[in-house]
């Protein structure tokens, strides 16, 4: 019989315990992102959002076309040529009724841009077409007014903002766009006049028959194969 003090199994137990603790500490350290890693992820999100903003031609309406170095990049209408005529007058000059919509300043300026809105509010605007100033800073889980944090009396973004198409973009893409607008742009103080459009344009003209549902109907529909 081996004396207790010389039993190799008794010596092995504390060694294994020490190794296990060290391994746990190393594992925990490996799973926690460092400040630099967190910053890198945020930078990649902003860069991805920039790519989407350029490729989706946001500057075509909000200023700067597809050139982030251009004067007036995303800071809103600066000339009547950037305005949009809505109604019969868009086809026949002078016809009535006639409304004018003006793309807003998308830079993070608190007074004249979107700086006062959170990234979640911007996401909700892109996903649901809701005006960010009247949108809660929470996740929305329904498209039915009054349910799932969806506003009871929703007010929608003015045309030609193509939110019925953008709403089908993945969450990570819409959040990346919000991140770029909030954290990737310099604030520009430029007040854009309010649009002279029909109130709640989308609320009065939007129908699932014309614009489909969110989420979109499952593939294939009657027009697909």
Can you name each region flagged by the protein language model?
Residues 2-13:
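Bacterial N-terminal signal peptides that target proteins for export
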Residues 15-18:
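Hydrophobic helical h-region of N-terminal Sec-dependent signal peptides
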Residues 21-23:
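C-terminal motif of bacterial Sec signal peptides marking the signal peptidase cleavage site
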Residues 39-40, 48, 52-54:
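N-terminal module-boundary/linker segments of secreted carbohydrate-active enzymes
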Residues 102-105, 109-116, 130:
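Mid-length scaffold segments of soluble, non-membrane domains
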């Amino acid at each position: 019989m081996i004396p207790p003090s010389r039993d190799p199994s008794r010596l092995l137990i504390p060694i294994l315990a020490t190794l296990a603790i060290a391994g746990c500490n190393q594992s925990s350290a490996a799973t926690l992102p460092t400040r630099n890693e967190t910053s890198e992820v945020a930078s990649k999100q902003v860069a991805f959002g920039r790519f989407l903003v350029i490729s989706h031609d946001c500057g075509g309406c909000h200023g700067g076309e597809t050139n982030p170095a251009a004067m007036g990049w995303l800071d809103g209408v600066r000339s009547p040529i950037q305005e949009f005529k809505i109604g019969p007058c868009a086809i026949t000059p002078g016809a009535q009724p006639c409304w004018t919509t003006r793309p807003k300043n998308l830079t993070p300026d608190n007074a004249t841009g979107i700086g006062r809105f959170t990234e979640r509010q911007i996401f909700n605007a892109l996903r649901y077409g809701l005006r960010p100033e009247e949108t809660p800073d929470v996740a929305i889980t329904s498209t039915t007014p009054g349910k799932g944090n969806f506003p009871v009396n929703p007010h929608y973004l003015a045309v030609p903002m193509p939110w019925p198409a953008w709403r089908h973009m993945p969450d990570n893409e819409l959040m990346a766009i919000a991140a770029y607008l909030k954290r990737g742009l310099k604030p520009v103080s430029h007040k854009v006049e309010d649009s002279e459009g029909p109130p709640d344009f989308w609320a009065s003209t939007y129908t699932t028959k014309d614009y489909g549902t969110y989420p979109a109907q499952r593939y294939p529909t009657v027009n697909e194969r």
